[in-house]
Curated annotation (Swiss-Prot):
CDD domains: BTB_POZ_SKP1. Disruption phenotype: Increased telomere length. Residues 105-166 are annotated as: Interaction with the F-box domain of F-box proteins. Essential component of the SCF (SKP1-CUL1-F-box protein) ubiquitin ligase complex, which mediates the ubiquitination of proteins involved in cell cycle progression, signal transduction and transcription. In the SCF complex, serves as an adapter that links the F-box protein to CUL1. The functional specificity of the SCF complex depends on the F-box protein as substrate recognition component. Its association with the holoenzyme telomerase ribonucleoprotein complex suggests that it may play a role in turnover of holoenzyme telomerase complex components. Belongs to the SKP1 family. This is S-phase kinase-associated protein 1 homolog. Pathway: Protein modification; protein ubiquitination. Coiled coil: none annotated. GO terms for biological process: protein ubiquitination; ubiquitin-dependent protein catabolic process. Keywords: Ubl conjugation pathway. The keyword Cytoplasm does not apply. It comes from the Eukaryota. It comes from Tetrahymena thermophila (strain SB210). Component of multiple SCF (SKP1-CUL1-F-box) E3 ubiquitin-protein ligase complexes formed of CUL1, SKP1, RBX1 and a variable F-box domain-containing protein as substrate-specific subunit.
Length: 166
């Protein structure tokens, strides 16, 4: 039997089975370790990841099953991710739904898929880059719980940081 055609069954948060090529699943260090420890006969539980997110992540793993994406240069030199990564990766992570993006970050971290975690975090960084605190709050729907006096005090205490970036 061809090693590349061995299938593994992943069990999502909703207890739904997703069948995938072993080599694709092994892009996750967590799954790779589980396969090495227990084999591929039993379902592999992925209790922290919804089926929808797991399918999206497996799409990424399928694309990169035969390669390792290059490191994303840090700090980011632009807020245009397509200038920093492969066009497929830029399109893949161009997610409008921030909740889904954060679920991918959590799942990539849990599954130990460093290249996807870096990509998703870089996407978040592009949403923050060159924005004011008010713009960042608006983007991420974060309430401002500082009084104007507290904000003024914080700005004064951190004036050196603003001067360093000007």
């Amino acid at each position: 039997m061809d090693k590349g055609s061995t299938k593994v069954k992943l069990l999502s948060l909703e207890n739904e089975i997703i069948e995938v090529d072993e080599e694709v699943a092994k892009k996750s260090q967590l799954i790779k370790n589980m396969i090495e420890d227990t084999g591929t006969e039993d379902d592999i539980p992925i209790p922290n990841v919804k089926k929808e997110i797991l399918l999206k992540i497996l799409e990424y793993c399928e694309k990169h099953k035969n390669d390792n994406p290059p490191e994303i240069e840090k700090p980011l030199t632009t807020s245009n991710l397509s200038e920093l990564v492969d066009p497929y990766d830029a399109k893949f992570i161009d997610i409008e739904n921030l909740e889904q993006l954060f679920e991918i970050i959590l799942a990539a971290n849990y599954l130990d898929i460093k290249s996807l975690l870096d990509l998703a975090c870089a996407k978040v960084a592009t949403l923050i880059k060159n924005k004011t605190p008010d713009e960042i709050r608006k983007t991420f729907n974060i309430p401002n719980d500082f009084t104007p006096e507290e904000e003024a005090q914080i700005r004064e205490e951190n004036k050196w940081a603003e001067e360093a970036t000007s």
